[in-house]
Amino acid sequence: MLDSVQIVLVILCSIFIANYLYLRWSSAAKRKTAVEMTEAFENQDDVSTAIYGVDHIYDDFYAKVYDQVIDGKVRQEVETHFTLDWAKSFRPQAKTIQVLDVGCGTGGHVDLFRTQGCGKAVGIDLSDAMIRQGRLNHPKADLRVGNAEVATTFAADEFNLITMFYFTYYYLKDRDSCLRNIFLWLQPGSCFVVHGVNREKFDPILEAASPFVGFSVQKYSKERVSRSKVSFDKFEYEADFQHEGSDAKFKEEFRFKNGKIRRQIHSLRIPTMEEMVAEIESAGFSFKKYIDMTSIGYEYQYLFCFVR
């Protein structure tokens, strides 16, 4: 016979499992995409498997599915809130926030900055396709194709807050030039906020593949789980994160119903957190604090806050 405590535990477990199954079913049913399979391949005739390196990944196809794959709306809202809260508390004398988001992707953060009272909110990204999609998603946001490694992209002292979210720092090819330009574009005493991770411990599972927002499977697994799987209406998606030291690969695969496969390989350089702070400080910035994102389920992920 089960005692009352055991009965309650069984009921709670049953509710949890039922909710989990319902959420997974309902979210899968809603994962409809606006893309056509033909958009995923440059050559439609004689290619069954296409492999894209980091310089060619962010095309029209990927731009259209990016937000659904990453599923980062909650994360963007919290990162924007944390960043503005710190910037305003650190510089209460600033009448308005003039923010630049480097590597803005489809512009989610930029639009949130705009709606939260920033006097100026600009986003730049190297990808034409991501900017085009971002303008469709957020028609009022100021999104531009631009390169942070080019000093003339903006004027000196144009911003008092610059951000790099969602692994952008790890994609940079010429970090020295980029940091030098950010230092130039920021007004003296202004803020620079960078997303960073503990590469050994952070959860690489995409939000779309997690059962609940902010839920990490790593707590309940003896070995690190690195593979994400998500079902969409036109393809099956799978991703895997691996690293050896600072060299990391994020591999994605789209399997279409006709048997064609699109594979993508993101190459990143992920230094230790101490090394990242040292790199940024060597460009003239002062490290002030980090904001731990564990409170929203992103363990071992942080917003590093610097001042010019």
Question: Positions of the model-derived regions?
Answer:
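A short acidic, Gly/Pro-enriched loop at the edge of an enzyme's catalytic core
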Residues: 153-162
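A short glycine-rich, Lys/Arg-flanked "PGG" loop and its adjoining helix->strand segment in the class I
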Residues: 176-191
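SAM-dependent methyltransferase
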Residues: 196-277
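Residues lining the SAM
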Residues: 163-167, 195
